C-alpha cells in the first residue's frame, strides 16, 4: 500500500477513538488565553480532534527525521537537523491563528521542549501599506498579489537550508502594517 496515494476521511466518532497516550495537555485557562475572537473550540475538541492530529504529526515528524538521517548517512554528509514545516491554510476568519497557537502549545508539550517549535504568520510577508497604496492594490490586501513572495521564498529557502539565523518580518495588528523590525529564529 502506498500511503502517498491515499487520502483518508474520518468521521469525528471514528477519529476520536484513535489512541493517544498523552494526558490532556491544555487547560481551560490556556485554551481561553489562546482562543481567537469568535472561535468555537472546546477542551473536548482538543481531546477528540487536536490530540490525535498532534500524534499523527509526531509520527510524520519522526518518519521525516529518520529518512533525513538515512539520506545524510548514504550521501556521507554531516547530519544536520532539518526543519519540519507545518503550514495551515484557509480563508479569512476560519480559526487558522487559533489552530496554529493550539498546535504550537501542544507540540511544545508533546516534544517536552526538546524540539524548537516556532509560529510564523504570513502577515509579515505582506507588502507595507505604502507599497500597496503605490501599486493601487490596498483593496487586495491579503490576496496573493499583496505578498512579497520573493521575501517569503527566501525565508523558506533559508529555513530549509538550516541557516543559523533566519529573520521573520513582523506585522502590527494595531497599525495593520508591516513593521521595520524582524524576529530572528535559530
Where in the sequence are the language-model features?
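ATP-dependent NMP and nucleoside kinases share a basic, alpha-helical "lid"
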Residues: 176-186
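Short, glycine/charge-rich beta-strand/loop segments that flank catalytic centers
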Residues: 72-75, 85-91, 119-123
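Glycine-rich phosphate-binding P-loop
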Residues: 86-105
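Short, well-ordered alpha-helical packing segments
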Residues: 104, 108, 153-156
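Extreme N-terminal, non-catalytic leader segments
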Residues: 3-85
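Conserved nucleotide-sensing/catalytic segment adjacent to the nucleotide-binding pocket
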Residues: 35-49, 118-121, 125-175
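Short acidic, glycine/Ser/Thr-rich loop/turn "cap" segments at secondary-structure junctions
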Residues: 83-91, 134-141
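Post-Walker A helix-loop "phosphate-sensing" segment adjacent to the P-loop in P-loop NTPases
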Residues: 105-118
Amino acid at each position: 500500500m502506498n500511503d502517498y496515494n491515499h487520502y483518508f476521511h474520518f468521521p469525528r466518532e471514528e477519529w476520536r477513538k484513535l489512541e493517544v497516550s498523552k494526558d490532556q495537555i491544555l487547560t481551560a485557562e490556556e485554551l481561553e488565553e489562546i482562543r481567537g475572537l469568535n472561535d468555537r473550540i472546546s477542551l473536548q475538541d482538543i481531546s477528540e480532534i487536536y490530540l490525535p492530529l498532534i500524534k499523527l504529526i509526531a509520527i510524520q515528524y519522526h518518519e521525516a527525521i529518520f529518512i533525513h538521517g538515512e539520506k545524510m548517512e548514504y550521501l556521507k554528509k554531516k547530519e544536520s537537523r532539518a526543519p519540519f514545516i507545518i503550514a495551515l491554510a484557509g480563508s479569512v476568519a476560519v480559526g487558522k491563528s487559533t489552530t496554529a497557537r493550539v498546535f504550537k502549545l501542544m507540540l511544545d508539550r508533546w516534544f517536552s521542549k526538546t524540539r524548537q517549535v516556532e509560529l510564523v504568520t504570513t502577515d509579515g510577508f505582506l507588502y507595507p501599506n505604502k507599497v500597496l497604496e503605490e501599486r493601487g492594490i490596498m483593496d487586495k490586501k491579503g490576496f496573493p498579489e499583496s505578498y512579497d513572495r520573493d521575501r517569503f521564498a527566501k525565508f523558506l529557502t533559508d529555513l530549509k537550508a538550516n541557516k543559523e539565523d533566519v529573520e521573520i518580518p513582523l506585522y502590527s495588528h494595531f497599525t495593520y502594517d508591516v513593521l521595520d523590525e524582524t524576529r530572528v529564529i535559530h
